[in-house]
């Protein structure tokens, strides 16, 4: 949107990232944390404005989505199954990249929250996935598909852009030149806050595995990877992301399945106490020491 070379962007982000991640300059992180929620709200409002501006296209857009996703146009060719498989594959890849469901990453943040009811915090985790995927992603898809930039019959993109630039052009159909600039700034803030979040995740994992002293090596390597991420081929970046997301999901999902009975017990206890108002002893953790600590806090 601003014609800034990727190399320059990478160098600037490496410097800022180093100040925050390695140097501990929290002021930049604090400003980012305050700006991101406002940008997210502004993005949703902007997408809603596009939605209502093109509301007459709702039927055509959702018809095109289902036809394209599930291969309804190819029923005669007998490849509906292939279309469904492709839709599920790409849906899961991009869904996991967007909402991190099943990766176990957001647990690090949720577990550090100061709440008395773990079930309530877990519900916020579920809500995040719904809001991200069902609300934000759906609004984004509608904004792009209803903008006239894509042929709904063939799926062909009618402009010479793709990815986030396509979203910027979709916003430009309603907001003019402000649209691409807004999307560029929003993505920059979202991406930078994500970088800070994942640096924390990795640092904690490295500390657990190799000790506190190892985190400085990790942080330096992480900051250098910011530049590589800014300049590398986008297709390779997606492939690496999908691969490592899958590798993270495998052990985490095994843990989720193994701990499901415990989660069910704690959830049923919460429903009985809070919703049904039954007089039962709170079950707040499977670990006795944490259970005792939480009971005292209540």
Annotate the PLM regions:
Residues 10, 115-131, 212-220:
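Membrane-interface alpha-helices at helix entry/exit sites of multi-pass transporters
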Residues 48-64, 72, 76-79, 112-113, ...:
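Extracellular/periplasmic helix-exit of transmembrane alpha-helices
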Residues 2-23, 41-42, 180-185, 214-232:
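Transmembrane alpha-helical segments of multi-pass small-molecule transport proteins
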Residues 6-14, 52-56, 67-123, 187:
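Hydrophobic, membrane-embedded alpha-helices of multi-pass small-molecule transporters
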Residues 253-298:
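Terminal cytosolic tails of multi-pass membrane transporters
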Residues 9-12, 42, 75-98, 135-137, ...:
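Select transmembrane alpha-helical segments in multipass membrane proteins
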Residues 14-17, 44-47, 91-92, 126-129, ...:
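Hydrophobic alpha-helical transmembrane segments of multi-pass small-molecule transporters/permeases
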Residues 4-66, 206, 238-268, 272:
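Membrane-interface loop-to-helix entry segments
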């Amino acid at each position: 949107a601003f014609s800034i070379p990727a190399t320059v962007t990478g160098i600037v982000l490496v410097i800022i990232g180093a100040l925050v991640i390695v140097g501990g300059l929290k002021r930049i992180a604090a400003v980012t944390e305050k700006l991101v929620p406002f940008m997210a709200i502004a993005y949703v409002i902007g997408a809603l404005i596009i939605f209502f501006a093109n509301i007459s296209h709702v039927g055509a857009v959702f018809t095109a989505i289902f036809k394209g996703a599930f291969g309804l146009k190819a029923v005669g060719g007998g490849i509906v199954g292939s279309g469904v498989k492709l839709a599920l594959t790409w849906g899961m890849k991009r869904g996991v990249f967007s909402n991190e469901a099943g990766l176990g990453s957001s647990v690090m943040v949720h577990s550090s929250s100061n709440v008395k009811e773990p079930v309530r915090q877990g519900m916020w985790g579920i809500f995040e996935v719904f809001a991200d995927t069902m609300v934000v992603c759906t609004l984004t898809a509608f904004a792009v598909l209803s903008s006239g930039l894509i042929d709904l019959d063939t799926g062909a993109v009618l402009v010479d852009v793709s990815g986030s630039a396509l979203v910027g052009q979709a916003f430009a159909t309603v907001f003019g030149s402000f649209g691409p600039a807004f999307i560029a700034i929003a993505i920059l803030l979202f991406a930078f806050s994500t970088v800070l979040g994942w640096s924390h995740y990795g640092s904690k994992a490295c500390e657990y595995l190799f000790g506190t002293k190892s985190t400085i090596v990790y942080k330096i390597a992480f900051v250098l990877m910011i530049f590589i991420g800014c300049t590398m081929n986008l297709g390779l970046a997606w492939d690496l992301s999908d691969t490592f997301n899958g590798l993270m999901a495998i052990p985490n999902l095994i843990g989720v399945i193994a701990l499901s009975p415990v989660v069910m017990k704690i959830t049923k206890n919460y429903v009985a106490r809070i919703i049904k108002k039954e007089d039962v002893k709170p079950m707040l953790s499977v670990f006795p020491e944490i259970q005792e600590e939480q009971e005292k806090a209540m």
